[in-house]
């Protein structure tokens, strides 16, 4: 909408703003669980993957879409977040804040989600955390994991790749957003933990 305004295309700008308002209202109502934003998906619904299967379907790895994204053994869609707390769940709002584009999500929900990222994704010492992927943080080092599944939430059997990892780009974005939202001590603690990993 901002770009359309800059180009003088008022009709397109109005259309884009209307689409945005509908999407914003839907996301705030349907994707916020009272504490953070989630991926709304039925992990057990094979038809969600089947919708992308086509005749002669082959992926780069040589398998078919259904083979790649459905586990017969567990009867579940692979590589999802579901009810987890994702480190980048409000990244769009961080970008909008930095660029002065305004509110993407409800401000109170954004602050709650940012606090949830600190509460659930920040691990002061990674030594007790199982990580089957790349090790960017270990033993007594701390950081924000890409996704966390707090007690009482369903963790997919085969979650989104790299969920248990820390990645400093994501971490710095989340930490700086915490600070921007007034969660200064939390954001600074995350930044200090990241910096200690590289000292």
Model regions and ranges:
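Extended amphipathic alpha-helical segments enriched in small hydrophobics
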Residues: 1-4, 20, 24, 163-198
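Well-ordered alpha-helical scaffold segments within catalytic/enzyme domains
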Residues: 1-10, 88, 92-105, 172-184
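Active-site neighborhood of glycoside hydrolase catalytic domains
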Residues: 1-36, 105
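Short, solvent-exposed positions on alpha-helices
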Residues: 11-14, 108, 185-189
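Serine/threonine-rich low-complexity intrinsically disordered regions
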Residues: 12-15, 45, 65, 183
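Amphipathic, non-membrane alpha-helical segments in soluble helical-bundle scaffolds
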Residues: 13, 17, 83-86, 164, ...
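Extended glycan-interaction surfaces of carbohydrate-active proteins
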Residues: 29-168, 189-198
